[in-house]
Amino acid sequence: MSYVKEAFDKVKLRDPDQPEFHQAVWEVLETLEPVFQKHQKYQDARILERLTEPERVISFRVPWVDDKGVVQVNRGMRVEFNSAIGPYKGGLRFHPSVNLGIIKFLGFEQILKNALTTRPIGGGKGGSDFDPKGKSDFGSNEILSVFHE
């Protein structure tokens, strides 16, 4: 079995409920296979395992008050993938479908996008299952303030 396939199988085994993350990882790893076949030192350093496992995953509750004065609670998360070339950088995604697999997929791709800029920044992403559509600025700002802390 190739190193790339072995590393991908570990990702699927470790995170079986994250198909979006699996797809993003496979698309990247598949294109890198010739590099890993040619350079054993990258395999020895376990580069793919280090690339596909976040340095940190933070999950937290996000309480906020809606326009009717009712407290609502959403889930927030932040995935910080790689700070090898600099501090984490990545945006926020707010949508009812957001889950850890989606945030990991977006954070994983952010590593590569940031590396291409040649700026010294790593990759990360944050988000919440909060749906900003139809919400007042007050409710949306409450959610955003949690991510700025």
What residues fall within each predicted segment?
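N-terminal ligand-binding/catalytic initiation module
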Residues: 1-149
